[in-house]
Amino acid sequence: VESYGAELYSSALTAVNDYGRRLSLAALGEVAGGIYSAEDFLDDDGFGGEGLALRVSIEISEAGISYDFTESSDQVRGNLNCPESVAAAAAYYCHCCLLPVGAPLCAGLFKDLKILTRKPSIVNPAFPAAVAAGNVETSMRLVDLVFRALAKALPHRIPAASQGTMNNVAMGAAGANGLSWDYYETLAGGAGAGPHRPGRSAVHTHMTNTLNTPAESLEYHYPLRLTRFAIRRGSGGLGLHAGGEGLIREIEFLEEAQVSLLTERRRFAPWGLDGGGDGEVGYNWLNGEKIAAKADIFAVAGDRLLIETPGGGGWGTPPD
């Protein structure tokens, strides 16, 4: 503003937004108009609610695009409730994936995009609903849900489902030396395969973008030992293009700790597309015994927590 003045600055913003809007409408113009719907299910909310439905109907027309989530499940007792703003962010992300590379991220891209929700529901809860996992888990599944619907309109552009969870692992304790500690990480998994490529293995996808914690840093700063960190072979869905593989991460506790797990895709598998196979669901283990997708546990020295993250869905009928 100091360099060019308020008037020129304002006109430049208007020009960028107008350009973004034209790009968005042009991209939508390449899609056959109509209504495209999809359904998927969250495993559970940790309080007995299971098979929680996520549903979307996407209407595409010359006037723009709308994402209707109103048929999704009611809000739940657990923290999978997803604020409307987070649901909108998931839809915006998917919308941007339809645009040309280099499209400017601006309000104009979303000028003709509408988000429809129902309150109270799992996609627009009422206060004081718990929402922590709505941001890290439900948002991931909304992305795959939207892609599943869009695949009906754009079958040769949309990938199969990715792992669909951030595999949240949190732990901590007062500490044997009197110093409290806490540690939180999200774990990568398999990416869904697409029409032109296999899915990548052991990567973060869609709504998560964290890096893995190096073993050296983990063991230096915390009373933990990383005993296994590997690709989970065979977890990606079969297909003309195979889904990406998940990973295996095993941590040994050197002193007692409280552990919280917030994970998904332990029951409903990442789906394949166009004849591709589903990816494998994930598993959580403590000392060889399976534990729930959402769990609070107390570990003692010598205990081992092992997480197997989901693979991605395959794309296309597998070759003979």
Task: Report residues per predicted region.
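Glycine/proline-enriched, intrinsically flexible loops and inter-domain linkers
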Residues: 1-320
